[in-house]
Amino acid sequence: MNKLRIATRGSALALWQSKYIQNLIENNTEVEVELQSMKTKGDVILDTPLAKIGGKGLFTKELEESMLRGESDLAVHSLKDVPVVFPKGLILTAISEREDVRDSFVSEKFASFNELPKGAKVGTTSLRRKMQLLIKRPDLKIISLRGNINTRLRKLKENEFDAIILASAGLKRLNLMENIKYFVPFSLDEMIPAMGQGALGIECVDKSEVIEILKFINNENSVIATTIERDFVAKLNGGCQVPIGVNAEISGDIIKVRAIVGLPDGSEFIKDKREISKADFKNFGTKLADEFISRGAIELLKRAEEMA
């Protein structure tokens, strides 16, 4: 096989991610790579909060359909946007080395989250972020913020918000930090990220010749950490649009796992932090989810969906 076709969204970040994988493949193999840009449902419907659009795979479905029709061979996703179940004929074949997994406080007026005045307007579409912000500061006004990163930063500069919350990885990949007055990453204890945050997931057609070309992209620590995170979410049957945070942080032979599930308004939540040996990572995400279920996580998520 001497050519691969990547189905990609047309946003600046999606194109950066696809070009990054394109360069990796072309620099490490004899394979030529072509990009095919398209729009997904999540790109087109910009006036509705993601949770209200409903369904999983808002940013992946059209790319998957292109692969299933035989028009493309793979797609590069922010792993946090990738559902835990794949259509028949497609497979998650590689997970890249992770960029910064943290969420960041971004503002033109206030130097830190703690400096926000009472009733400040904070922009985010993520129910996970909304929940964790309101746990800390129930007085904040959390306002839906859609669009690509540049659109969100423009709205911030136009004073629509006192601050916005963004994934650090996207800001770093697009070198946007110098355009921001105040950029402060939350610690992992302050704001637990989404499953897979900071990693790129390579989804491809389930064909051995394609899988063989792509497997060199796999990063062992990324695979271990995101396996824990995705297993946790899969057991809870949670998609990208429910208030679930989970992160596995690897340091040497130790993994710290942080997880949170709750209501979007932050009024009720279940939170835990565990430390395990790297050798024990298999099935740990599922076991931790079982413990959350025994503490009422499924009922909490059902109520969260009704509130969203």
Swiss-Prot record:
Cofactors (names): dipyrromethane
SUPFAM superfamilies associated with the record: Periplasmic binding protein-like II (SSF53850), Porphobilinogen deaminase (hydroxymethylbilane synthase), C-terminal domain (SSF54782)
Transmembrane segments: none
Name of the protein this chain belongs to: Porphobilinogen deaminase
InterPro entries named among the record's database cross-references: HemC, Porphobilin_deaminase_cofac_BS, Porphobilin_deaminase_N, Porphobilinogen_deaminase_C, Porphobilinogen_deaminase_C_sf
Quaternary structure (record): Monomer.
Cofactor annotation comment: Binds 1 dipyrromethane group covalently.
Gene Ontology biological-process entries: protoporphyrinogen IX biosynthetic process
Keyword Transferase included in the entry's annotation: yes
EC number: 2.5.1.61
Keyword tags: Porphyrin biosynthesis, Transferase
